[in-house]
Amino acid sequence: MSNQNLGLETQAIRTQLERTQYLEHSVPLYLTSSFIFEDAEDMRASFAEETPNNKNNSAENENGVLGIPRQITELFPKKERNIYSRFSNPNTSEFVEKICLMEGAEDGYAFATGMAAVYSTFAALLNSGDHIVSASSVFGSTHTLFTKYFPKWNITTSYFDVNKPETIENFIRLNTKILYAESPTNPAVDILDLELLGKIAKKHNLILIIDNCFATPYIQNPIQFGADLVIHSATKLIDGQGRVLGGVTVGRSDLIREIYLFSRNTGPALSPFNAWVLSKSLETLPVRIEKHCENALKVAEFLENHSNVASVKYPFLKSHPQYEVAKKQMKLGGNIVAFEIKGRIEAGRKFLDKIKLCSLSANLGDTRSIVTHPASTTHSKLTEEERLAVSITDGLVRVSVGLETVQDIINDLKQALE
């Protein structure tokens, strides 16, 4: 039985490292900085990235570990000989393999944070003089990366209006190398037509990179629509409980190879412990996401009918401008609800001060509901003009809907809005 033929839920649970001689049921934590070699030839071959030496697996035969028939829990192949945990680690490899299977990707690399994934992916693939075409609505740190740091290396970025995808090709130049977007976007929850982006990227021979953080592999798979690479901040819904940081990029093996070589030498690797936590978190991702989305839709419907709310954006609300696109490419609407509170920036601050149950935090995708006012927090370093350019108004509030009893979440938002 091949893992590719299994359901996503089964892949998330049963994709697992080969068992050791102890026949453990749950994968152990490989908390080690480095790995040993059997002899000089083993060491040479490992650094030369030749076929892994299997001397250490002498107890294993074609029927499985210690003669016990191989189960679907032991199906993913050993891709490399582990040398040093900055390069690879069994726990990290397992986590990456799960994401690859769930996203339909050829290969991947895991990072210490989501922004390490974003930076390393771009830095590995771009050269001085290259150009990026990006959606205007992107995460604040990504925007800062594009506008403040990349220009130091003569890498420029042009932004297209997420509500005017027909204008994308107007921004493409001879030196454009990457087309980039988030969908849904952070924090405005705009939706981009991934199929359209895929066609444009293919037509102009561009690398299409999609940040799939808000959707997760359970809700949306951008590679199906033509994306070359998919990025996740695993800190968010993949972990799901606000415990660890992590990021991952998956996609075409030739591009991942470049990202791997860059990251192997610059050191943004995910720690074995965090990889172990994140891999275990994926086992419950489908169940968690179903409940997150169920709660979020009810919260969005409540907010849409509140007199102190000017507007609400949630992908599966029929009032969302890109509702039809969302239904085409997303299985569910996600757990993020964005709404415009009447009264601009001061009203947003007062609303946060009145919150009692929900948490005030810059994170999202937690079991606990989180409320954020982007204009005064995550995007406060942008000018008002820059914020408006990325769909962030002074009254915008982002709610990461958690797993609490949904009526308790609604009651908290209701009293804070009054």
Summary of predicted features, one role per range:
Residues M1-E9, N56-L66, E418:
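Basic/polar N-terminal segments that are highly enriched at the extreme N-terminus
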Residues S2-Y30:
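Short conserved active-site loop signatures built around small residues
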Residues Q4, R14, E38-D39, M43-R44, ...:
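Active-site C-terminal subdomain of aminotransferase-like
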Residues E9-L17, D107-N308, K313, E324:
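Conserved PLP-enzyme active-site core in the AAT-like
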Residues T20-E24, F76, C100-M102, A124-L125, ...:
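Solvent-exposed alpha-helices and their adjacent loops that cap or buttress functional pockets
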Residues S34, D39-A116, S141-K148:
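Conserved N-terminal alpha-helix of the aminotransferase class I/II PLP-enzyme fold
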Residues E106, T147-K148, T156-S158, L174, ...:
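PLP-dependent enzyme catalytic core of the Aspartate aminotransferase-like
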Residues Y149-P151, N265, K354-L357, K414-E418:
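Short, solvent-exposed amphipathic alpha-helical segments in soluble enzyme
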